Amino acid sequence: MLSHKTQHKSIYTREKSYKCKKCGKTFNWSSILTNNKKIHTEQKPYKCEECGKAFKQHSTLTTHKIICAEEKLYRCEECGKAFCQPSTLTRYKRMHRRKKLYKCEECGKAFTQFSTLTKHKRIHTRGKHYKCEESGKAFIWSSGLTEHRRVHTRQKPYKCEECGKALIQFSTLTRHKRIHTGEKPNKSMWQTF
């Protein structure tokens, strides 16, 4: 069995039998040659989750992560998220601006894509064929009128199994159930109203 000192010496005295065809460098270990080959490719498989910057070698990513963790100099004023590169912050800020760029003039609802706004606008332009005789309020869908009529009839078909409270609309029952479960409403759901 070789002593540790002898094994260590062999690293420096051993013939470097692994040669890179691209740059001509030679290495003692095939794993180091494999690492070296990554330098010559366009592939950057190691990505920083913090700022999105990609690297060819894992060791470079590790070094970057240390710097990134220590020096988050560029902070988004809107949400507080920090980045280690100004270009990454700039890209991120664009996302905030795009978030709700297209707004409906009719109801004020905002969308991230113009095509979604266009589809939404059909709600306002489509004929409201279902009209309530009592209040004159019109609806696009018959289900909307049916649900609205319950306001006048005081019909409450949706009942909570937990406490027995009856409600006019299913959506109101869903919100009511949160009292019993302690569940908080989804923030994005409420942003649409």
Swiss-Prot record:
Coiled coil: none annotated. GO terms for biological process: regulation of transcription by RNA polymerase II. One of its GO terms (molecular function) is zinc ion binding. Pfam families: zf-C2H2. Keywords: Metal-binding, Repeat, Zinc, Zinc-finger. One of its GO terms (cellular component) is nucleus. A zinc finger (C2H2-type) spans 18-40, 46-68, 74-96, 102-124, 130-152, 158-180. It comes from the Eukaryota. This is Putative zinc finger protein 726P1. The lineage of its organism: Eukaryota, Metazoa, Chordata, Craniata, Vertebrata.
